[in-house]
Amino acid sequence: MIISISGFPGSGKSTIAKLLAEKLKWPRYYMGGLRREAAKKRGLTLAEYNKLGESDPSTDLEVDNYQKKLGEEKDNFIIEGRTSWHFIPHSIKIYLDVNKKAAAKRIFSHLQEENNRNEDHNLKTLEDVEKSIEERYLSDKKRYEQYFNI
């Protein structure tokens, strides 16, 4: 069994994925982490990398192929990613939604924790986070419609 977890930024995907993986004693694969690593290799923030992806499909290709391969070769795992359900269609799909203001509060609180660097922006206020979430959502939506027709 494969469980894919998707949802709006700040909806608790990572929290739920970690809890499920721990409870089931299954591995957890985090696609957001792979995208952040790829952005870092190019000297970009995740926001810049996502923006680049609107005109360069290669920014998604590595993670997309990785997800497909996982779905074909492995079983009994949790995968967390905005498009994981699409690339592993036989997975059990969980979608988490959240009010945008609540999402911004969750993310802002997370960024305030001691060990979390604000890697993507200089997000100093809740309003900055709300704006960042909206920009990310629109960028992701554009890429997903353009490249995956979803």
Segments the model singles out, each with a brief description of its role:
Residues 117-150:
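Small-molecule kinase domains that catalyze NTP-dependent phosphoryl transfer to phosphate-bearing small molecules
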Residues 5:
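Hydrophobic anchor at the beta1->P-loop junction of P-loop NTPases
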Residues 11:
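ATP-binding Walker
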Residues 22-63:
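Conserved substrate/cofactor phosphate-moiety recognition/catalytic segment
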Residues 8:
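P-loop (Walker A) phosphate-binding loop of NTP-binding proteins
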Residues 89-114, 122-125, 132:
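Conserved phosphate-donor/acceptor-positioning beta-strand/loop module used by diverse small-molecule
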Residues 55-101, 147-148:
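Glycine-rich phosphate-binding loop used to anchor ATP phosphates in small-molecule kinases
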Residues 14:
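Walker A/P-loop
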